[in-house]
Amino acid sequence: MADKSDLNALSGRFRGYYPVVIDVETAGFNAQSDALLEIAAVTLQMNKEGWLLPDETLHFHVEPFEGANLQPEALAFNGIDPTNPLRGAVSEHDALHAIFKAVRKGIKDKGCNRAIIVAHNANFDHSFVMAAAERASLKRNPFHPFATFDTAALSGLVLGQTVLAKACLAAGIPFDSSQAHSALYDTLQTAKLFCELVNRWKKLGGWPLPTAESE
């Protein structure tokens, strides 16, 4: 098990939280009534020098839950056809069960206490994950019920940008707008962005925190 006093360990960096980057594509803005259509998750790791890096990736197309609203404007925006059999969609239960299982393993392997969602405008993604988990009656939800790390807010502070594409470009991360609004692509880019923000703070001397002995 990782040593939480090791500031170069993932468990020592975020107060025992295990950060997992999430992006969802949906059929609207209401997590209670509108369909979850796609979800991707990227776990993170810390190397021996304490630099944050993307780790494993999970990605699922999701079947709309029974009675879900499908807002035409949202479908036109993300380009998803929920009726297309080639999507290979799975149920909310199966998608989240697989993600939660992988996240719980990561928490254990990294010596962390609980997972926390990292996302761009994180309240949106968090609300859909929580609503889908409740509908699927998944009791062992590893994510914090309300705390998140929001890369939109962090990017506004560090880069002066809040739009994902602009924040990535400002951070020197390529962003292909033609692939935007794919949960997989957006999650991968958000993971790179979050790692860059955390690592940049370390390079600038913001982490580890100064101690009385080092002053």
Curated annotation (Swiss-Prot):
The keyword Magnesium applies. Mg(2+) 2 binds at residues 23, 25, 181, 186. SMART domains: EXOIII. PANTHER family: DNA POLYMERASE III SUBUNIT EPSILON, RIBONUCLEASE T. The active site is at 181 (proton donor/acceptor). One of its GO terms (biological process) is tRNA processing. One of its GO terms (cellular component) is cytosol. Gene3D superfamilies: Ribonuclease H-like superfamily/Ribonuclease H (3.30.420.10). It comes from Yersinia pseudotuberculosis serotype I (strain IP32953). NCBIfam families: RNaseT. This is Ribonuclease T. Trims short 3' overhangs of a variety of RNA species, leaving a one or two nucleotide 3' overhang. Responsible for the end-turnover of tRNA: specifically removes the terminal AMP residue from uncharged tRNA (tRNA-C-C-A). Also appears to be involved in tRNA biosynthesis. Its cofactor is Mg(2+). Residues 20-194 form the Exonuclease domain. Keywords: Exonuclease, Hydrolase, Magnesium, Metal-binding, Nuclease, tRNA processing. Mg(2+) 1 binds at residue 23. The record marks 29, 77, 124, 146 as: Important for substrate binding and specificity. Belongs to the RNase T family. It is an enzyme of class 3 (hydrolase). The keyword Hydrolase applies. Its EC number is 3.1.13.-. Binds two Mg(2+) per subunit. The active form of the enzyme binds two Mg(2+) ions in its active site. The first Mg(2+) forms only one salt bridge with the protein.
